[in-house]
Amino acid sequence: MKLLATVGLALCALGATTWSQAQAQAKLCDKPRQMDGFKTCADVEKAEAEGAFVLYSTDPEPGQAKLVGAFNKAFPKIKTTYFRLQAGALYAKILSERQAKSFLVDVIQISDMGMILDFQKKGGFTQYISPEMAAFKPEYKSKPEGYWTWGSVIMAGIAYNNKVTPEAEAPKTWEDLLNPKWIDAINVKVSNSGLQHGVWFMLKPLLGEDYFKKFATQKPRAFDSYVQQYGRLVDGQDKVIMGAQYSGAIEFTAKGAPIGFVFPDKGLPAVSETYGIVDGGPHPHAAQLFMDWFLSPVGQKALAEALALHSPRDDVPPPPGAVPLSKMKLLIPADWEAFEKDRPSFAKEWDRIVGARR
């Protein structure tokens, strides 16, 4: 399989007219400081004096705790805090906080590029060009550079319990999920999920407008987190996950769970988990230091170990036990503005499909 992704063609044009010429001309510091495994332009002493760092993220709490714990291990003087919600709810939270002039978070990660672009347009990010950004492809970074950067690539396939469903009987294609035998046996994510939106956005053109109308008759149940989804699969409450997050399968399989994962031939919808420093955050120096650490091979490996997520960096290996990006057929939106505009209609239709079945 080949990596199939014409990523972010619209990104080059986005944001350039939004920001002043002075902002666009921001550059890397003259003499980045060499740390243990990464370079930084942050004032490390000031970051440690701030003594704290706050991350908002869509990732499950146990993985977040491991990730910020690894940062805290590298910088023990900086106490780390995290908060987790699905993308839509998390974005609503930070917008509400900013409207109330309550600046509580230093770095935010959202798994929905439409929300990231909207936040950039609203001036929600502060520009900081990390020395580690040079290792990321242009399409994985904001224009101008320094407002946000892809921290990981997440992809969705089909998962099943291989103790309940033999491999020969498991669905092999997206169309197989329409088989009546899967009625009342499928779970998905709620409409607040950036990845679920990506599944919808990329599969509709491939499978036709009627696909999701037919899928609705399967009576899928929606859940907030892949932890819930895979937990129900392991317990036998559901038989299949449609749009199953691959990192969740890797995580549960590593724990000995009987999970089978299918890579449909037509491809795996994929989106990014994107990180940026929030403008007006309470610990700006710690935020810069975190971004430098996180975007480096050291931080990216910590992410892979904590959450089984794939790094966009070519020099970072995939999570243990995972297929590398180069071996996947990824379906990544090429027009993120269209993706952003599609969200309201997706949310309305997806909520109708799942109804109250949660």
What are these regions (language model features)?
Residues P138, V153-I154, W182-N192, K213-A216, A222-F223, F294-P317, ...:
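Periplasmic-binding protein-like
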